[in-house]
Amino acid sequence: MAVHVDNVKDLAKTNEGVSVILNRYTDWKCKSGVTEAPLLPSNLGTRITDYAKTTLKGDSVALNFSDLVLSLGATVSVGTPGSVLVELINPNMDGPFQLVQGQSLSWSPGSGRPCLMIFSIHHQLTADAEPFRIRISNNGIPTKKTFARCHAYWGFDLSPRMRYYKNEPAKRIDLDVGFYKTHLSNMKQVRDYVQYTFDNSRMDGNPQLVAKSTMNVVPRIADVPKYVGIAPPSRSGNHQEATPDDWLKQYVDKDSETNKLSDVESSSDSSSLLSMRARSRRYTKNYKIPIKRHPQATGEVGTT
């Protein structure tokens, strides 16, 4: 597993002390038994703690995690029995309290449909605490090899104070097409949809992704694929639901505004020619049909 961070200085801003980094875990293979992966490697956690305490000048620095998105795709054939249980674990707690309430989902790799799992981890930890972990348990899948591939996307920010958010239950988005045929089968397309999820499913006041992260690049509208079979992620509160079409409209190339006049001028000749042809067709059609006049208009009404 690899965490892509360009610079440790990007982990915090000196002006407000808040910055969000979106990281990516690549080639996360789920095998038989239980697979656990930390959301923050120990070597990076030490550097974050040292830098945050120096920059934010606090003995206890809050490490605020945000939404976590998992992309799960099966590597076993369709019809394979068994399922997996995906849980969000807080290792700073003891026993059954390690499982974060409401952050547990199940999935069947043999269903032939990949899925996206969105976890709400708006929790606060000190920078020197043990980070959250993802636990994937194999329940009855008859294989000792890899049965699924997982890619995790998550964000966090550093702050000198704790912030409290309302946690939402975890939700799963199933894709209606096969894994190898879906539009979200490669990393770039999954990343684009995850970016859409981050931008539209956050609650008011939550930290947003910063442009310094390489995962926060939104492609041009010509490069954005059509997401088939995916329900748009829900938004909390009374906000209006956002659709992928609305998301695409936000990133229309600005050059389209400058080219609007030239497009109108180039199409004026063709439009006028079409209108002339249409008028000629209507005139020819009406010319062949005899005109029926109203009796009152011709004066044929008899007088009494």
Curated annotation (Swiss-Prot):
The keyword Transferase does not apply. The keyword Transcription does not apply. Residues 257-304 are annotated as: Disordered. Residues 278-295 have a biased composition (Basic residues). Signal peptide: none annotated. It comes from the Viruses. GO terms for biological process: symbiont-mediated suppression of host innate immune response; transport of virus in host, cell to cell. Residues 264-277 have a biased composition (Low complexity). Keywords: Host-virus interaction, Inhibition of host innate immune response by virus, Suppressor of RNA silencing, Transport, Viral immunoevasion, Viral movement protein. Pfam families: 3A. InterPro entries: MPV. Cell-to-cell movement and long-distance transport of the viral infection. Also acts as a suppressor of RNA-mediated gene silencing, also known as post-transcriptional gene silencing (PTGS), a mechanism of plant viral defense that limits the accumulation of viral RNAs. This is Movement protein. It comes from Carnation ringspot virus (isolate Lommel) (CRSV).
